[in-house]
Structure formats: C-alpha cells, structure tokens
Amino acid sequence: MRVLIAGCGVIGTVYGAHLGAAGHAVSVLSHPPRTGDISVRGLTARDVLTGNRVETGAVVVPDAAAGCYDLVLVAVRADQLASACAELTGLQGTPAVLFFGNNPGGRAAIPAAVPGAVHLGFPGIGGVLRDGTADYARIRQQPTALQATSDPRLAELERALCRRGFAVQRVTDMDGWLAYHAAFVACVTAALYRCGGDPARLADDRPTLTLMCDAVTESFRALRHSGVTGLPRNLATLHSPALKLVAVWYWARTMSSPAGELFFAAHARHAQPEMRALAVQLTARLGNSPATSRLSELLLAAPPASP
C-alpha cells in the first residue's frame, strides 16, 4: 500500500517504520523540524525489551495533495486533531484515513471535509523519542485497536502489523472505546501530575493511587449510565468496585516498573496540553455531581507536572 503518516512522534515513527519494513511505501507529511531529520535518516524504532531495531526510508511530502495514498495514518495528539484535519482536506481520491490516538469525541470530532473513508483506532505501544529514534515497548494488555470494518485497507494494515509481531484487536464500538480510554488516561495523568510526573512517586503514594482508582471507577460508571458502550473488558474488570484494592496494588506495581515511565509518565509530561484537554472534556461531559465527587477531586486539583 501507499501509506501517508501524519504525525511522526513516537506512534507515527514506530508504526511507519514497521509498515515500511513490511514492504509498504511510506510517506510522511512535512512537519519541521522533525521531518527534516526523517528526510535524512528515515524512520527508526527500537524495541527496548528485545533490542530489535527497525529502520525504513520515508518520503517527506509538503502537503496531503502531493500524492495518492491507500492509507493515511493520523497519529497526532487530541489537541492537534483540528489542525491535522485541516491539512488533510487536500487528500486525493478516497483513501482509508485512520485516526490513531486519543479522541474522546470519536467520529463526531472528524470534520466531513476530510476525504476518504474515516476509521478510528488506537496504538498498542508506548515510548519516547530519543535523538530521532523511537524507543518503545508493546503494551501486552492493550493490543493495537482497529475499528471493526470490512475496509480491505484496514485488513491489510492488520496483516502487516501481525507479520511484524503486533497483537491486533478489532473493536466494534470504537467511539465508545475511545471515550472510556480517554477517561482512564485523564485520571492516570492527573494522578501523575499530583506527583510531579514521577511514576515512582505515584507508586509510593497510596492515597493518590486510591483516589485515581476511585475516579476511574466513577467515570466508567457515569459514562455507562449516560448510554456510552464499548468499555474495554480488561479495564472494566480491573476497575470494578469489588477489585479496588487489587487495582491500587496493580497500578503501584506498574508505576514502579519501566512501564510506568514508558507507557504513561513520559507522554504525560510531554503532552500536558492534550492531557489537560482530556480532563476538561471529561469534566464537561460528566458534570460535577456527588456520583463523581472523587473524579472531580482528582481532576480539578491536579497541579502541573514537572518538566
């Protein structure tokens, strides 16, 4: 396939590098200074758990109208979504356009002016960019999520990722999945901000971990009561009221491990505008009531994280 990557942070770099290694022709939408480095060095990703490194060449294009593509992978932060969509209005033909990141508004947040077949998804990795290389790890509990659809381009994407060792799940209600996941992420990052963005500090702070888990449970319950479906099963189980102590223990262990930094803290510090926006959207959606008192306590009093 001819693939265009819009957004070359960790996610765009990792998935773009693997798609190139799988034999697909990868182009990258220009966004200096990052794409200046890509034009020279290509896309490079390193699995920090295995040490495996993948490199692929990529063509940097000045705008979305510069070529015809089968698949467009939009890997931008939620606060960059509107500007990314504006850049994509010049796409030629009818590509599959996969929005691949935090987006609690779901399909309704994507303007009709974006050409092609719009789909939703979410990555199954976390990591950091270091000197142009994306150091990453796969999240075993969260496979790459792709909208359940008959679009053959998403089927080819799934095949390519599976060949590259990625676990992939197809999600019927991707809109709901993204709403619940955004609520979860907003709570976790707010807890991290209370601890200066330091996952080790959060791991040792049981009152904040307990507040975080209470807030996640409340937000899930409020979304469910408002008619939102699509709650990921693993999160539904872990954050059921009966397993509160288990959830606190689980997140203490996770935050004290390398996963705390790779999967949560690094992005929380780097993308504070996005995380704040998720918290504001969640508060606006659920309101402030006794049923979400712990959620309000967590989100409304979270201080800025340390750089």
How would you name each of these model-derived features?
Residues R224-P307:
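NAD(P)-dependent Rossmann-like dehydrogenase/reductase catalytic/cofactor-binding core
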